[in-house]
Amino acid sequence: MFVARSIAADHKDLIHDVSFDFHGRRMATCSSDQSVKVWDKSENGDWHCTASWKTHSGSVWRVTWAHPEFGQVLASCSFDRTAAVWEEIVGESNDKLRGQSHWVKRTTLVDSRTSVTDVKFAPKHMGLMLATCSADGVVRIYEAPDVMNLSQWSLQHEISCKLSCSCISWNPSSSRAHSPMIAVGSDDSSPNIMGKVQIYEYNENTRKYAKAETLMSVSDPVHDIAFAPNLGRSFHILAVATKDVRIFTMKPLRKELSSSGGVTKFEIHTVAQFDNHNSQVWRVSWNITGTVLASSGDDGTVRLWKANYMDNWKCIGVLKGDGNPVGNSCQGIFGSSVGSAIQSLQNSVNGTSSSGRKHS
């Protein structure tokens, strides 16, 4: 059975994001109190705050970990129109600091003229790259050419999405058959604007990102978006958090069917749509194999979704903050599968937790 542990976060305002590192033993939180906190898991399973610092001059919307191959590196983004990259260093300068760690700001990315709403490191096979999106509808992709010098970042790409951007997700596939791809969600509140999820793909010929697809069926504001880890699948799975939970499959069409030399075209299907939260859904997060999806909503629950052998998606668990499963609101199974799902979520490849908006 899933065990819930309450953590006294000591944030002074709303907590907007919770992010696990690659191994699931470190956690970062960010808040409207303009701070980021880093938590480490002890041997007995307790979480201890090991660092807390003021990061921005506005609400901090998102925080995310780089792959540990690049060291202990965080990125944050804020209403103050900036994103920042932070690195943990172990003090060696004098006896007092030796062995103690602290976080140092390596760079501030100041290209946005409006609130920076999401920040995500690219999959590690692409090198140390970072994507941001902002309320003015621009996605920016930066690269650190020297991974030993995180103070130098170059702006590689600017993508104009024409809609206010709220969230981004890299396609984690490392297959050479798949070009780098990024999904962008919009929280534009106008019901007349369709297609609030856009997919951009990198074109080797033009060396630019071009729009590959628009999910026209998504017309409500999008709060979160997440590609599933791709373990040998020939197609992609994308989860979208809006007023409900939606799961899409994207199957690449054969090259002769898509324009030669252009972007890949996809056959897109909505394979699941769940309104069980009966409220806005704020976060979606996959486990490490891309087989279990967690969602969290304003109903105060985390719901777990999994496909059966017929590829029908079902709810397999509903969790509340007190650790108790919620009775009959989910037809599925509880017990070991839920526990293992939560464990795999903590070891999620993209390090993102499924926690939605939380109060401190």
UniProtKB/Swiss-Prot annotation:
Keywords in alphabetical order: Cell cycle, Cell division, Centromere, Chromosome, Chromosome partition, Kinetochore, Lysosome, Membrane, Mitosis, mRNA transport, Nuclear pore complex, Nucleus, Protein transport, Repeat, Translocation, Transport, WD repeat
Heme is among the record's keywords: no
Positions of WD repeats: 10-49, 55-96, 111-152, 160-210, 217-258, 276-315
Family annotation (InterPro entries): G-protein_beta_WD-40_rep, Sec13/Seh1_fam, WD40/YVTN_repeat-like_dom_sf, WD40_repeat_dom_sf, WD40_rpt
Single GO MF descriptor: structural molecule activity
Biological processes annotated in GO: attachment of mitotic spindle microtubules to kinetochore; cell division; cellular response to nutrient levels; mitotic metaphase chromosome alignment; mRNA transport; nuclear pore organization; positive regulation of TORC1 signaling; protein transport
UniProt feature coiled coil, ranges: none
Disulphide-bonded residues: none
Superkingdom of the source species: Eukaryota
Free-text activity regulation comment from the record: The GATOR2 complex is negatively regulated by the upstream amino acid sensors CASTOR1 and SESN2, which sequester the GATOR2 complex in absence of amino acids. In the presence of abundant amino acids, GATOR2 is released from CASTOR1 and SESN2 and activated.
Biological function: Component of the Nup107-160 subcomplex of the nuclear pore complex (NPC). The Nup107-160 subcomplex is required for the assembly of a functional NPC. The Nup107-160 subcomplex is also required for normal kinetochore microtubule attachment, mitotic progression and chromosome segregation. This subunit plays a role in recruitment of the Nup107-160 subcomplex to the kinetochore.
Protein family per UniProt: Belongs to the WD repeat SEC13 family.
Subunit field text: Component of the Nup107-160 subcomplex of the nuclear pore complex (NPC). The Nup107-160 subcomplex includes NUP160, NUP133, NUP107, NUP98, NUP85, NUP43, NUP37, SEH1 and SEC13. Component of the GATOR2 subcomplex, composed of MIOS, SEC13, SEH1L, WDR24 and WDR59. The GATOR2 complex interacts with CASTOR1 and CASTOR2; the interaction is negatively regulated by arginine. The GATOR2 complex interacts with SESN1, SESN2 and SESN3; the interaction is negatively regulated by amino acids.
Stated name of the protein: Nucleoporin SEH1
Organism name: Xenopus tropicalis (Western clawed frog)
Gene name as annotated: seh1l
